[in-house]
C-alpha cells in the first residue's frame, strides 16, 4: 500500500514528483497532489471532541507496535534529530523490537573536508552532528541493545559519477547535486529481505505538525516537501514500504493530536499566535521557523535534550546544493562529479524548474477556535 500519497496529471497518477512535473510540462495540464485528506477529515468529523484525551506517548507506542505487528523487518532512518530520536526512544522504552537503524554518513569524503566542532551552527556544519550527536547514541546502543543492527551507509563511497538524464526523473524531488545522491540511497538489507519475500517498513520521522492561524481558527495541514524525503528509493521492491511515523493515514490521530497540543498551548499563550498568523507571517523567515521548531519539539516530544548540538536547517543555496552542501561544492573531491551533474542538470532544470521550489499542500484541517 502506498502510504505517502500521490500526484495526478490528467488521468495519470505518479508517486514520483519529478515524473509528475515532467508530465505536466509535456501535457500542459496541472499537477494535483493527494495525501489522504478524506482520512484526516473523516477522523476529525467523528472524533473532534475527543482530541486531547490520549497522551501522545501512548499514540507513539501504539504506532510502533502497529508497525511491529505488520512487518517482518523494521528499519529506522535515523538522523539524530528530535523526530527520529523520539521514534527510537519509543521502541526502546516500550521494549518493542526494532531490527535496524540506518544512518547516512559519507565518512570516506566527510573526514577530508571538515573537523568536528560545536562552534559553527550553520547548516554547512551538518557533518559535525554525526560526531557530536549520532555517534554517541549508536555507541550506547551497541552495548545496551546489541540485537539492533546498525548500518552506517557511506553514500559517496559508490559510483556517484553514474548520472544520466533518467537519474533526475527517478530522484523524485529536484533539490541539488547531493540530494540527488541522498534521496536514492537506502539500506541494502531491504534488497536482501525483499528477495526473501519479507515485508519491510522503511520508517521516517516525518513530521512535526504544520500550523496556521486565520479567521480566529487554528488549522493544521500537510506539505509534500518533507514527505519527498521518503521518496521513491526502493520503487522496485514491492515488499518494502516507506512509513511516515507521524503523518500516517493508518493513525491520523497522531498528527491531529500533535496539532491539538500546539492549539492548546496557543490558547494559554496567545502572544505566540503571531508566529502562525496567516496574515502576518513572511516566507523564508528562518528566525520564525526556528522558534516554531523549538516550541513544537517541547510540546510533542519528551525524549529530546535541547542541550544537544544541532545546526540550523538548510536553505536553498544554489542549483547545485543547499547551505548544508557548501563544503562539498568547494571541495576538489567532487569537481568531476559536479561536472557530470551540471551536464545532465542543464537539460532537466528547464523542465522541472518551470515550477521552481514548487511545494504542494493539502487543504487545511480545523483544530479549534481561538479568539485573539
Regions picked out by a protein language model, each given a short descriptive name:
Residues 1-74, 90, 96-372:
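Nucleotide-activated chemistry modules centered on ATP-dependent adenylation/adenylyltransferase
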Residues 86-87:
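Hydrophobic positions on the alpha1 helix immediately C-terminal to the Walker A/P-loop
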Amino acid at each position: 500500500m502506498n502510504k505517502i500519497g500521490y500526484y495526478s496529471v490528467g488521468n495519470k497518477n505518479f508517486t514520483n514528483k519529478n515524473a509528475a512535473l515532467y508530465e505536466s510540462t509535456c501535457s500542459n495540464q496541472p499537477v494535483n497532489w493527494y495525501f489522504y485528506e478524506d482520512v484526516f477529515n473523516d477522523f476529525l468529523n467523528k472524533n473532534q471532541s475527543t482530541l486531547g484525551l490520549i497522551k501522545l506517548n501512548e499514540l507513539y507506542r501504539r504506532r510502533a507496535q502497529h508497525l511491529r505487528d505488520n512487518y517482518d523487518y523494521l528499519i529506522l532512518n535515523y538522523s539524530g534529530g528530535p523526530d527520529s530520536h523520539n521514534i527510537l526512544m519509543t521502541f526502546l522504552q516500550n521494549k518493542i523490537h526494532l531490527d535496524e537503524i540506518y544512518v547516512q554518513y559519507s565518512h570516506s569524503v566527510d573526514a577530508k573536508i571538515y573537523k568536528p566542532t560545536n562552534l559553527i551552527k550553520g547548516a554547512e556544519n551538518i557533518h559535525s552532528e554525526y560526531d557530536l550527536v549520532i555517534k554517541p547514541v549508536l555507541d550506547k546502543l551497541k552495548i545496551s541493545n546489541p540485537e539492533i543492527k546498525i548500518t552506517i551507509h557511506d553514500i559517496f563511497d559508490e559510483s556517484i559519477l553514474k548520472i544520466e538524464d533518467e537519474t533526475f526523473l527517478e530522484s523524485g524531488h529536484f533539490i541539488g547535486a547531493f540530494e540527488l545522491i541522498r534521496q536514492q540511497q537506502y539500506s541494502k538489507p531491504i534488497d536482501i529481505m525483499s528477495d526473501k519475500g519479507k515485508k519491510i517498513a522503511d520508517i521516517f520521522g516525518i513530521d512535526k505538525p504544520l500550523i496556521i492561524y486565520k479567521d480566529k481558527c487554528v488549522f493544521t495541514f500537510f506539505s509534500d516537501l518533507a514527505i519527498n524525503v521518503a521518496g521513491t528509493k526502493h520503487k522496485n521492491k514491492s515488499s518494502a514500504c516507506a512509513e511516515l511515523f507521524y503523518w500516517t493515514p493508518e493513525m491520523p490521530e497522531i498528527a491531529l493530536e500533535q496539532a491539538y497540543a500546539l492549539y492548546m498551548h496557543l490558547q494559554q499563550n496567545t502572544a505566540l499566535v503571531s508566529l502562525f498568523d496567516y496574515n502576518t507571517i513572511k516566507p523564508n523567515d528562518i528566525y520564525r521557523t526556528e522558534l516554531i521548531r523549538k516550541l513544537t519539539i517541547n510540546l510533542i516530544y519528551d525524549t529530546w535534550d535541547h542541550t544537544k548540538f544541532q545546526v540550523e536547517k538548510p536553505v536553498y543555496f544554489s542549483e547545485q546544493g543547499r547551505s548544508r552542501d557548501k563544503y562539498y561544492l568547494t571541495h576538489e573531491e567532487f569537481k568531476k562529479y559536479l561536472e557530470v551533474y551540471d551536464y545532465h542538470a542543464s537539460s532537466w532544470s528547464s523542465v522541472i524548474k518551470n515550477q521552481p521550489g514548487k511545494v504542494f499542500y493539502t487543504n487545511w484541517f480545523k483544530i479549534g477556535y481561538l479568539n485573539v
